[in-house]
């Protein structure tokens, strides 16, 4: 099931960006397809570090394909999360809205994330939600 979920997500992104006419689309398309394979293999092999590397690389590729995917505030939030509370971050959603997806460091609670965001980034209306999807894998 994980393979299907991630293949669907990444391949939908590939379609969107390939059709956008962006000069970086072809490179992004190729890299995201490779990344999809790496991500699926990381789940199959229970390789948490590689999984996180794939998520982080995904975010970088999205920003490369379209600078509109992020801005300085989102980049700062992502960098701070990676430093203090998360092992991986990426963005999800559509233009004008969305959310920052984070794979939390071991032992970090959702309350700690909420407090961290409120203190370090008070301009962000945080509605942190915790979804435990990978417990059975790791």
Task: Go through each PLM region and give its residues.
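Glycine-rich nucleotide-binding loop
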Residues: 95-97
